[in-house]
């Protein structure tokens, strides 16, 4: 059966197309923190790079229409926070991210610190439910640890005044933002425990950015909350704001006003029922809005994918890929030609007459040196043989006999006198000794 008529059999191109649509339509927008590597900016103006961390990496493309809005020029090694869509480069089947915006890592770094501290404290059991203290059902005195000029304090006081005007309140003022805020918050909690005049504490502030709320993600504050003998309700920011203090506290309230409601008596059960219904309605409405927004985003993405501009981007990316491959092929070809030329040059050097003459000169010099060495050894042997022969001649030499005390007598003409009959009266005789001669006359 043909693959074109069987709906259960895919071609490769169809499979890649289906996977791309699945990635783009189902997952939508993602935020990602990572380090840039393999950064490339072809003449088309698009950017191609890899985002990585210590464990994994993913290929990314940022088209010219988006990257021209980036306020800095990325380089390898940059830590960045990106907003991206998941996609698939169909010709190669490569999963990739299409980057829509990029900025240097800031909040991403704080989030990593947040996650690291959260994991550390959780491993020590500071978040365990078994270590939580029960919040008094009807507190006799409420302590408030927050800024004395912040809106959070007035929100708490307004709720307490409306719900339980007779409830005593003690305020422990402190900074709730800045470098010194964490130390002051911890000191205020310690001061409340030392004075021991309240049976529940509310620690919090109004909403703000991640940096504004960062003092409530401080390890000192977290450990001070965990060590408090008085139950603590955290009430930091809005409902969507979550801090380390929320995990360590005995109870988390979504807002300072909600914390005030938790510690105050409600004089009207009807108000409670109404509030419960209101909360359910708000939750249902938020859920409905979220689903509708998700549907709108999905439909807008589908419409965007059908736009000719998107097809042009994919074709441009493919052209960039072909350009890169062509450049690599040319570089490889040139490198091979250079190697071949180098080998030919080496062979020519080996066959060069100048080189051969130089080698023959060196060989002749070595032979000449060997001949000189052989002549020196031959002369040495001859000198040794002559010395031995001289010793032998010296042994039989007349002079050697004279040295042993003998003498030789000769006539004046030089004949050796060996018999008495060779001389007569009046002859002059020469007697040779080892150190000279004696002349005498025969009487």
UniProtKB/Swiss-Prot annotation:
Annotated signal sequence range: none
Keywords on record: Cytoplasm, Exonuclease, Hydrolase, Nuclease
UniProt-listed Enzyme Commission number(s): 3.1.11.6
Superkingdom to which the source organism belongs: Bacteria
GO biological process: DNA catabolic process
Coiled coil spans: none
GO MF annotation list: exodeoxyribonuclease VII activity; nucleic acid binding
Catalytic activity: Exonucleolytic cleavage in either 5'- to 3'- or 3'- to 5'-direction to yield nucleoside 5'-phosphates
Function as written in the Swiss-Prot or TrEMBL entry: Bidirectionally degrades single-stranded DNA into large acid-insoluble oligonucleotides, which are then degraded further into small acid-soluble oligonucleotides.
Family membership noted in the UniProt record: Belongs to the XseA family.
Oligomer and partners: Heterooligomer composed of large and small subunits.
Descriptive protein name: Exodeoxyribonuclease 7 large subunit
Organism annotation: Vibrio vulnificus (strain CMCP6)
Gene behind this protein: xseA
């Amino acid at each position: 059966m043909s693959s074109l008529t069987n709906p259960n059999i895919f071609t490769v191109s169809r499979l890649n197309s289906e996977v791309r649509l699945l990635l783009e339509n189902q997952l939508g927008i993602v935020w990602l923190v990572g380090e840039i590597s393999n950064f490339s900016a072809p003449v088309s103006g698009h950017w191609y790079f890899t985002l990585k961390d210590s464990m994994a990496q993913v290929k990314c493309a940022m088209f010219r229409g988006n990257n021209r809005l980036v306020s800095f020029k990325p380089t390898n090694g940059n830590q960045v926070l990106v907003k991206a869509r998941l996609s698939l480069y169909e010709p190669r089947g490569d999963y990739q991210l299409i980057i829509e915006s990029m900025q240097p890592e800031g909040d991403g770094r704080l989030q990593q610190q947040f996650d690291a501290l959260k994991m550390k404290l959780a491993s020590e059991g500071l978040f365990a439910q078994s270590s939580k203290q029960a919040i008094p059902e009807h507190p006799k005195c409420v302590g408030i640890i927050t800024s004395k000029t912040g809106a959070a304090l007035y929100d708490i006081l307004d709720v307490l005044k409306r719900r339980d005007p007779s409830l005593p309140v003690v305020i422990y003022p402190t900074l709730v933002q800045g470098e010194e805020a964490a130390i002051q918050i911890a000191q205020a909690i310690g001061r409340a425990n030392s004075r021991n005049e309240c049976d529940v504490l509310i620690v919090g502030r109004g909403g703000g950015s991640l940096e504004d709320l960062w003092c409530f993600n401080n390890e000192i504050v977290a450990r001070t909350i965990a060590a408090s003998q008085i139950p603590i309700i955290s009430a930091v920011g809005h409902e969507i704001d979550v801090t380390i203090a929320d995990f360590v506290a005995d109870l988390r309230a979504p807002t300072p006003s909600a914390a005030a409601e938790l510690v105050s008596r409600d004089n009207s059960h009807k108000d409670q029922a109404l509030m419960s219904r209101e909360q359910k309605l708000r939750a249902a409405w938020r859920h409905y809005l979220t689903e509708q927004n998700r549907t709108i985003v999905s439909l807008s993405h589908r419409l965007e994918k059908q736009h000719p501009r998107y097809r042009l981007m994919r074709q441009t990316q493919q052209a960039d890929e072909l350009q890169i491959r062509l450049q690599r092929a040319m570089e490889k070809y040139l490198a091979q030609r250079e190697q071949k030329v180098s080998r030919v040059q080496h062979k020519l050097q080996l066959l060069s007459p100048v080189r051969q003459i130089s080698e023959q000169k060196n060989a002749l010099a070595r032979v000449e040196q060997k001949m000189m060495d052989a002549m020196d050894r031959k002369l040495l042997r001859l000198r040794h043989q002559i010395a031995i022969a001289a010793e032998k001649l010296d042994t039989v030499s007349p002079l050697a006999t004279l040295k042993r005390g003998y003498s030789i007598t000769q006539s004046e003409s030089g004949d050796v006198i060996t018999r008495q009959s060779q001389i007569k009266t009046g002859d002059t005789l020469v007697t040779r000794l080892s150190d000279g001669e004696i002349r005498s006359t025969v009487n």
